[in-house]
Amino acid sequence: GQQIPNDKYYTKTPYDDSIVYDELKEEMQRQSEYNDSLKALKGYAQENLAYMGDLTDTYEGRRNQLILDTYGERAIHSFYDQTGLGAYLKYDFSSLLVLLLLLLGISPIISSEKETGMAPLLASSRFGRHKTIAAKIGAMALFTAFFAACFFLMDFLYYMVAAEFHGAGSALYTLIDFKYTPLTCTIWQYILLQWLAKWLGMIAVGLFFVLLSSIFRETYPVFILGTGLIALFMTVGERFRLFNPISMLTFSEQAQELSTFNFFDYPVLTITALPISILLLVFVLVLLILSHRYVL
């Protein structure tokens, strides 16, 4: 017969409670065991430091201390169904679509002027040469920001409506794929950070397209080489990730674990060094574009 609602059950009936439990038990168990897994990880780091003795002022010693400092105060105290948030943060396909649109839109940005014979006229004008190129770089950044914002918002709204974002105010490490992240932000803050990271990566790729367009006098080789450049960036992947703009488009992969590299015996977080190195790449690309001998 029909079950009578009872306030002692979360869903008012024992049957519905059992259904909810079956759906969420793995995630509930994972979150309940999170504190124990961190305790084991910190214990391992402490054992390493004790074993090193006086050698703690080395890369490995400092790295183990970084592990203790990063994970020292972490704990999960509440439970949310974060399946939708996890799926959204792993979705990167729209970034590839934006790159293809950038390739189509940016390839002729300078080469088309050479094809139509406008380059000499612009070069002889009062605001030609560097000012014109600087304006084109700014237009490329705005063009990139517009398309990136459109796709970011569409993805965000779709997942927010279809999957629902429960517990987005929780710490990022409460998500199963980010349980060992070195970042200390909330999920909402990370979403904004990921948007900025992807936009920076797209700007870097767009500058490569502008550089190619400044070299060639026709658009089709720019388009062909630009396509090959995207494929190259996707192929080299992790091997050159510090100077690979695609690493910013797959920012979630970089943020999921505590990854470091040795910098004069000090552990530097990859997630910190990555945006700095891409900003340096952007600066170098801008200088190359402005100083290239084929520019106007």
Functional labels for PLM-detected ranges:
Residues G1-E47:
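Membrane-proximal extracellular/periplasmic loop immediately following the first transmembrane helix
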Residues Q31, S37, L41-E113, A134-I215, ...:
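Secretory targeting signals
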Residues L211-I215, S277-L296:
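Junction motif at the cytosolic side of a transmembrane helix
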Residues L242-T260:
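Short hydrophobic, aromatic-rich alpha-helical segments embedded in or entering the lipid bilayer
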Residues S125, I215-F216:
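Transmembrane helix irregularities
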Residues A123-R129:
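Short helix-to-coil transition segments within interhelical loops
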Residues Y220-F233, L249-F251:
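Central hydrophobic cores of alpha-helical transmembrane segments
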Residues F156-A168, E218, E238, L242, ...:
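Transmembrane helix-loop junctions in multipass membrane proteins, especially transporters and channels
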